[in-house]
Amino acid sequence: MEDLKSIIRNIPDFPKKGILFKDITTLLGDAKSFQRMVDLLSHRYVGQKIDKVVGVEARGFIIGAALAYKLGAGIVLVRKPGKLPSKTRSKTYDLEYGTDTLEIHTDAFNKGDRVLIADDLLATGGTMAAVVDLISSMDVELVECCFMAELEFLEGGKKLPEGKVFSLLKF
């Protein structure tokens, strides 16, 4: 895994001073590394009968679509308000300074679907906790929340269901 971790570029003071940003675009842009990352993540879920993979806006779409393809599952998009064309349900959640809202189509799942939620990076866990809450009343089974990378020192996994978090790369 160290080889994949080393491809991710560090950008100091982005998006604000004091933050060391993990820029995953370097890994995504390297074909062999991207393929390896998708293969390693998808291997964990082979045989688990995943019906739908939820991709969280925006980089979660990349990870989610690749996993859905590899697993023979459908892809469901969770987006910012006003971006989905049909009837939606929404979840507003707290940020460090203010709030944000996510939406999902009300007809995104079939009853009993086994769902994998995918995103690029687990940091504070606020966004993923909102996604878990958003789908929790939609009569589906949450298999796991998976991430390409996790910033462990931020302890975002503590906001998510115990035993339902997997991160391929940990920083």
UniProtKB/Swiss-Prot annotation:
SUPFAM superfamilies: PRTase-like. Keywords: Cytoplasm, Glycosyltransferase, Purine salvage, Transferase. GO terms for cellular component: cytoplasm. It is found in: Cytoplasm. It catalyses: AMP + diphosphate = 5-phospho-alpha-D-ribose 1-diphosphate + adenine. One of its GO terms (biological process) is purine ribonucleoside salvage. Its main location: cytoplasm. Its EC number is 2.4.2.7. Pathway: Purine metabolism; AMP biosynthesis via salvage pathway; AMP from adenine: step 1/1. The keyword Signal does not apply. It comes from the Bacteria. CDD domains: PRTases_typeI. GO terms for molecular function: adenine binding; adenine phosphoribosyltransferase activity; AMP binding. HAMAP family: Aden_phosphoribosyltr. Belongs to the purine/pyrimidine phosphoribosyltransferase family. Homodimer. Catalyzes a salvage reaction resulting in the formation of AMP, that is energically less costly than de novo synthesis. This is Adenine phosphoribosyltransferase. It comes from Citrifermentans bemidjiense (strain ATCC BAA-1014 / DSM 16622 / JCM 12645 / Bem).
